[in-house]
Swiss-Prot record:
Protein name as catalogued: M-zodatoxin-Lt2b
Propeptide: 23-58
Record-stated family: Belongs to the cationic peptide 03 (latarcin) family. 02 subfamily.
Any one GO cellular component localisation term in the record: extracellular region
General function of this protein: Has antimicrobial activity against both Gram-positive and Gram-negative bacteria, and yeasts. Also has a strong hemolytic activity against rabbit erythrocytes. Causes paralysis, but is not lethal when injected into insect (M.domestica) larvae.
Length: 84
């Protein structure tokens, strides 16, 4: 009976350890997923900034589009930072 109690206590201890580390791993995975989402968003933003290099963006309205794009990006950055 004594060995059964010791084995049960060890099993409970192992389950407690496994449960406590599982949440940390899940939180780390969620943080990494958020980081990947941010990196993907930044990559798309960089691609959009590079549109002025394409031949399609050059033309009669190219300068207006660039000017509007820069103003829109700076406005979005100011709003994101809370500077109104």
């Amino acid at each position: 009976m004594k060995y059964f109690v010791i084995a049960l206590a060890l099993a409970v201890a192992l389950v407690c350890i496994a449960e406590s580390t599982a949440y940390e791993v899940n939180e780390e995975l969620e943080n990494e997923l958020d980081d990947l989402d941010d990196a993907a968003w930044l990559a798309v933003a960089e691609e959009l900034q590079g549109l002025e290099d394409f031949e399609e963006s050059r033309g009669l309205f190219g300068k207006l589009i660039k000017k509007f794009g820069r103003k829109a990006i700076s406005y979005a950055v100011k709003k994101a930072r809370g500077k109104n």
